[in-house]
């Protein structure tokens, strides 16, 4: 069971962290015991008699100039001398090593260079290069080659970095590493090629969201998506639990670019009912999208396994969470295009978060025109205008929200269970709609019917839905 699997994994990781903390404590205890034994041995060397009248010092670094002590025969050593004598017991036998020397930037490996963007899709390069001479280095899609991309005369230009005999060059002299090559081109202002006359001016640093693969510790597989497997994991730096979406290396470049679309959308968002992006790993293959680990699993499975035990108020709170998240996306002109219970996640405290932004798009006018057929379109959740004309908008997301409401109050049932996708389209075009679930409040079913208005303009906004659901929930106290 995915929900139980994720919870079990979290408990395993907490146990591992506790065991590590115990090991550290045991090491500290052993160290203190060794110090105690050493101190005891020193005391035994002094014997049972009275302390000596003076401490024999090996040098004159400590002040003994107190005239009063001299007059008393030096029988009362100063506190500083006693401290020095005791601390000598624990003085390290070896001097500290010299401070580490900083590695010059040009000598750092390629993946540590700020201007190296890894498996960045070619289509995204133009968005990063803004001024003539701006450049970055990336991995060629589908090939084991490196590309130097630079903006010149208003157009991004792409140069394969030739590699032969362990030397790198666009043309002419070779260098032992790509960082050395880039450093030379920047310092000398030598053109990349004689024919192009292009010179490098400013390195474009990688996105702050970029993580190294080494920053992650992968755990067990917890799911599978359209692009590859989904794993649990943690950040090596602070043990933050994460979900890691992977992209199969065998997929063509255009599909890999679509995989990263989800991260591109989520970079801009911060909302308690939207799953949080932590970073992307694009420095090498396979590409990863790293997100917060929502430990309750997906909403559809949650409804089917836990729904019968939930109070109506809890169900209303959860669909209210969905409306709040979608209201936020609506304000950002973001069209989700795949809103469904399977694409929402549930925290351990039953907070719902909108997830799976792989089909999402941001459009300034709030309308997205899709092409390419219906192969990946979730027909039973999709509005008629999107199916018929490829026209997606927040209004088409509202239609899908109505199906999500129906899934919620039918406790995870499948919509149009006895109809194929084509039969569903014909049924809806003729005015057919899903019936009211047995446990659904009448006020909520009226909201569903508003979601399923055939004309997009007749459907309410998510803001209106959120307010109405809050009002309904208050009446169910």
Curated annotation (Swiss-Prot):
Compositionally biased region (Basic and acidic residues): 58-74
Domain SH2 per the UniProt entry, residue ranges: 115-204
Domain Protein kinase intervals: 216-477
Keywords of this entry: ATP-binding, Kinase, Nucleotide-binding, Oncogene, Phosphoprotein, SH2 domain, Transferase, Tyrosine-protein kinase
EC number: 2.7.10.2
Any one GO MF annotation of this record: ATP binding
Residue numbers spanned by region Disordered: 49-76
Binding site for ATP: 222-230, 245
Domain of life: Viruses
Keyword DNA repair applies: no
SUPFAM superfamilies: Protein kinase-like (PK-like), SH2 domain
Residue numbers annotated as active site: 338 (proton acceptor)
Residue positions where Phosphotyrosine is found in the record: 368
Enzyme class at the top of the EC tree: transferase
Recorded catalytic activity of this chain's protein: L-tyrosyl-[protein] + ATP = O-phospho-L-tyrosyl-[protein] + ADP + H(+)
Coiled-coil annotated spans: none
Family under the similarity heading: Belongs to the protein kinase superfamily. Tyr protein kinase family. Fes/fps subfamily.
Remarks, miscellaneous: This protein is synthesized as a Gag-Fes polyprotein.
PANTHER family named among the record's database cross-references: TYROSINE-PROTEIN KINASE
Protein name as it appears in the record: Tyrosine-protein kinase transforming protein Fes
Gene: V-FES
């Amino acid at each position: 069971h995915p929900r139980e699997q994720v919870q079990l994994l979290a408990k395993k990781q907490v146990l591992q962290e506790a065991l590590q903390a115990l090991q550290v404590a045991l090491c500290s205890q052993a160290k203190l015991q060794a110090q105690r034994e050493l101190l005891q041995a020193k005391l035994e060397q002094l014997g049972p008699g009275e302390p000596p009248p003076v401490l024999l010092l090996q040098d004159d670094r400590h002040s003994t100039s107190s005239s009063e002590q001299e007059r008393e025969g030096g029988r009362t050593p100063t506190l500083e001398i006693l401290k020095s004598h005791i601390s000598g017991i624990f003085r390290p036998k070896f001097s500290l090593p010299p401070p580490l020397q900083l590695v010059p930037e040009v000598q750092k490996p390629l993946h540590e260079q700020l201007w190296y963007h890894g498996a960045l899709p070619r289509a995204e390069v133009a968005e990063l290069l803004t001024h003539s001479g701006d450049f970055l280095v990336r991995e060629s899609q589908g090939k084991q080659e490196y590309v130097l991309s630079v903006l010149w005369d208003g157009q991004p230009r792409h140069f394969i970095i030739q590699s032969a005999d362990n030397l790198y060059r666009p043309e002419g002299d070779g260098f032992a590493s790509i960082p050395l090559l880039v450093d030379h081109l920047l310092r000398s202002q030598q053109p990349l090629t004689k024919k192009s006359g292009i010179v490098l001016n400013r390195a474009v640093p990688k996105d702050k969201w970029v993580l190294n693969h080494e920053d992650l510790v992968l755990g067990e597989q917890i799911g599978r998506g359209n692009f590859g497997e989904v794993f649990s994991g943690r950040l090596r730096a602070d043990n933050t639990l994460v979900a890691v979406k992977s992209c199969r290396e065998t997929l063509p470049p255009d599909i890999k670019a679509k995989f990263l679309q989800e991260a591109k959308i989520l970079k801009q968002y911060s909302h308690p009912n939207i799953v949080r992006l932590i970073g992307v790993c694009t420095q090498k293959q396979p590409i990863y999208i790293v997100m917060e680990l929502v430990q309750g699993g997906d909403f559809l499975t949650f409804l089917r396994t836990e729904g019968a035990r939930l109070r109506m108020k809890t169900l209303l709170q959860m669909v209210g969470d969905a409306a709040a998240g979608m209201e936020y996306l609506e304000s950002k002109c973001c069209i989700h295009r795949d809103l469904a219970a399977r694409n929402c996640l549930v925290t351990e405290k039953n907070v719902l978060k909108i997830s799976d932004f792989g089909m999402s798009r941001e459009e300034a006018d709030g309308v997205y025109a899709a092409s390419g057929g219906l192969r990946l379109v979730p027909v039973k959740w999709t509005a008629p205008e999107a199916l018929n004309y490829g026209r997606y908008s927040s209004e088409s997301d509202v239609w899908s929200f109505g199906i999500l409401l129906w899934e919620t109050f039918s406790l995870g049932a499948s919509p149009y269970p006895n109809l194929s996708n084509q039969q569903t389209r014909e049924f809806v075009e003729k005015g057919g709609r899903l019936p009211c679930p047995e446990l659904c409040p009448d006020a909520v079913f009226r909201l569903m019917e508003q979601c399923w208005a055939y004309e997009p303009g007749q459907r309410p906004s998510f803001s209106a839905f959120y307010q109405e659901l809050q009002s309904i929930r208050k009446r169910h106290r």
